[in-house]
Amino acid sequence: MLQLIKGFKDILPGEADRWRRIETLAAVTFGAFGFSEIRPPVMERTELFKRSIGEDTDIVEKEMYTFEDRGGDLVTLRPEATASVVRAYIQHKLYADTPVAKLYTIGPMFRRERPQKGRYRQFHQINAEAFGVAAPYMDAQLIFMLMILFSALGLKDTRVHINSLGCAQCRPAFKQRLLSFLEGRKADLCEDCTRRIDRNPLRVLDCKVDRCRHVSAEAPQITDFLCPGCAAHFDEVTGLLTDLGVGFDIDKRLVRGLDYYTRTTFEVQTDRLGAQSAIAGGGRYDDLVKLLGGPDQPAVGFAVGLERLVELVAMEETVSDVAHLRLFIAALGERARRRAFGWMCELNRRGFDVEMSLEERGLKSQMKTADKWNASHVLIVGDAEMETGSLILRNMKTKAQQEIPLGDVPGALITMMDNRQEN
């Protein structure tokens, strides 16, 4: 029997429903903030990622799925989405339509990492990118929007960690000081970091090897080298977050693993996933559009790891009341099944999640099916109930039951489900 490739995962129907609800809620949330969806391809020219992510990064050096196609072009399955969105933004001149472009995308990424819990070689991200605004208001708005999404998903114990990486004006002095420090600690670094320090010493700060992390903890801090403009920008971002009621920790050791970040960088972390604490991350990349051949346009964005988000939502047991409002109709007898089928189709037509058994089965068997389907309510209707004119609606969580007059179906069910949606 053929099996999955190592590091890949099938998302089965029950779990896929949770994925779809999260993706839908993200789209609605981002839309309320003026973001529009974009769908770039999953494959790009390799050069795009080398130039944007950085040739000295682990992603480019070790993790990308890169191959030569039959035409002789070197292509790569995207390891992240920002570079693709920027490429599309430039190629299609989206900057010509409006001075500010807010875009989001949801889809799979590919990295040949060591598979572990919550981390796969095909993984999925929700990305949001905003172009054309250099003001710190946009940084704060994106972080606020992200936390609104997490709140809507019912997530708890999440915290923003934020830092500034400076700009082309102030970063060189920091790099020089960092390089001097690392040269004296070469013996304590891993082989990769020893090789990288001359070309890009910042990569050492992002290394996950324990002995390199110990060295990083003692390294100079970039916030001590910020130019007046970067310092003011960072102060304004944190001030705006405070005004918005977003809690955060200033993490002077936070360095994202992509070369294109400037100024603001941040992660949202949780202590509920063990060592894999980051569930989202992003920052400002004011030089990337120009680097990839576009106009000099500032930009800021973030990415959310969907696999980790799904795991967290499953821990909370609910995305929202609406997401779990699922009705199963248990019909006993042909007459009851005929009526129930009509009700189900009418409710399906109105967009509600309703299911029933289309073949003759006992009540016990149907209740097991309803439970496996994660029904929130079961409507029990048999030929006897058809005679008395009173049906039973059971709440599967509380086990409470209520009677619904036969003449009120499906109107009573539509009203109930509409009211739950409004709540």
Curated annotation (Swiss-Prot):
Keywords tagged on the record: Aminoacyl-tRNA synthetase, ATP-binding, Cytoplasm, Ligase, Nucleotide-binding, Protein biosynthesis
CDD domains, per the entry: HisRS-like_core
SUPFAM superfamilies assigned to the protein according to its UniProt record, in alphabetical order: Class II aaRS ABD-related, Class II aaRS and biotin synthetases
Record keyword Ligase present: yes
Catalytic function, reaction form: tRNA(His) + L-histidine + ATP = L-histidyl-tRNA(His) + AMP + diphosphate + H(+)
GO cellular component: cytoplasm
Principal location: cytoplasm
GO molecular function, one term: ATP binding
Documented EC number(s): 6.1.1.21
Pfam families linked to this entry: HGTP_anticodon, tRNA-synt_His
GO biological process: histidyl-tRNA aminoacylation
Class in the EC hierarchy, top level: ligase
Intracellular or extracellular location(s): Cytoplasm
InterPro entries noted in UniProt: aa-tRNA-synth_II, aa-tRNA-synth_II/BPL/LPL, Anticodon-bd, Anticodon-bd_dom_sf, His-tRNA-ligase, HisRS-like_core, HisRS/HisZ
Subunit details: Homodimer.
NCBIfam families, alphabetized: hisS (TIGR00442)
Entry similarity comment: Belongs to the class-II aminoacyl-tRNA synthetase family.
Protein name listed in UniProt: Histidine--tRNA ligase
Organism: Desulfosudis oleivorans (strain DSM 6200 / JCM 39069 / Hxd3)
